[in-house]
């Protein structure tokens, strides 16, 4: 499963050894038609409200600016989940995520994260905005960033505050998501989990948080007007030096099996199990005491006219197509 995210304003109509799947296209743009201005606080929702939320796509299909698609592979159940949520708290904000489950209940974990994570992100942002109302701190509605202190935008402080706000929201929502999975009464996440690659496009700003080995790749034009691929994420594999150091410090083990030497895995200190092929994931609580974490990598990027689209994809697309 993958996603192709347009960075323009124009509208457009797992498995560690996962099987190849067709690459879907998911275009995100900003519709030019006039719509009612809405702010972040207008979009606070609960899980019970999700089925009635407009501009939220999570199955094969399309909306006014996007289309998404996933297909069953050759092995077992399709454990991928995906979401595009246009007008996410504001008319020019779009949330997009791809989640690749693994383990016996990975498909359920991925779907749970798909539904709950954006709501948690929304809740943290709304809470932060509520605290800022009436103060001279930065507030924003959609693409505009405003402050009661006029000099802030001269030295970039407004952008810094916006970046800090989104970073905090991503970190807190990922932490809350993993905590909910751990205490869920009907979902066994002990040896099951999910990756996550999530992006928020707010005007020309791109905010991204991710765990696991699902990727974000941007298509951008170089000086010769040729399209080049720019990988925006790092595959958080167990053999990355910083990841391996943390895991070993927590008494976990990292090694590859003889019959697949190219796939490093995380193992318990006292047993050759479960063999997780990533260093960060939601769930997988059997390994959380041994170095596997759910803290996301966060990044911010200012999009330019050269940036054309972004592909979000699970490992079935990245490694096998």
Where are these regions (language model features)?
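PP2C/PPM-type serine/threonine phosphatase catalytic core
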Residues: 2-321
């Amino acid at each position: 499963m993958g996603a192709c995210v347009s960075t323009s304003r124009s509208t457009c109509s797992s498995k560690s050894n996962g099987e190849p799947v067709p690459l879907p296209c998911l275009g995100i743009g900003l519709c030019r038609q006039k719509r009612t201005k809405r702010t972040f606080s207008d979009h606070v929702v609960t899980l019970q409200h999700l089925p009635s939320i407009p501009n939220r796509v999570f199955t094969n299909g399309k909306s006014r600016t996007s289309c998404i698609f996933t297909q069953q592979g050759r092995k077992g159940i399709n454990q991928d989940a995906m979401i595009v949520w246009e007008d996410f708290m504001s008319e020019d904000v779009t949330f997009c995520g791809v989640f690749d489950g693994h383990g016996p209940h990975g498909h359920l974990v991925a779907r749970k994260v798909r539904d709950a994570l954006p709501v948690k992100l929304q809740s943290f942002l709304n809470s932060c905005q509520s605290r800022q109302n009436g103060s001279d701190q930065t507030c924003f509605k959609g693409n505009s960033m405003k402050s009661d202190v006029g000099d802030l935008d001269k030295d970039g402080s407004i952008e810094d505050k916006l970046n800090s706000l989104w970073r905090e929201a991503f970190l807190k929502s990922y932490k809350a998501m993993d905590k909910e999975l751990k205490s869920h009464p009907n979902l066994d996440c002990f040896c099951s989990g999910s990756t996550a690659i999530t992006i928020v496009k707010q005007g020309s700003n791109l905010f991204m948080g991710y765990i696991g080995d699902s990727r974000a790749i941007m298509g951008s034009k170089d000086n010769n007007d040729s399209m080049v691929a720019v990988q925006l994420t790092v595959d958080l594999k167990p053999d990355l030096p910083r990841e391996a150091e943390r895991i070993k410090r927590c008494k976990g083990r990292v090694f590859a099996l003889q019959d697949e030497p190219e796939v490093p895995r995380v193992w318990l200190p006292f047993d050759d199990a479960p063999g997780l092929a990533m260093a960060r994931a939601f769930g997988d609580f059997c390994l959380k005491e041994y170095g596997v974490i759910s803290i996301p990598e966060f990044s911010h990027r200012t999009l330019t006219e050269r940036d054309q689209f972004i592909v979000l994809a699970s490992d079935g697309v990245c490694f096998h197509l």
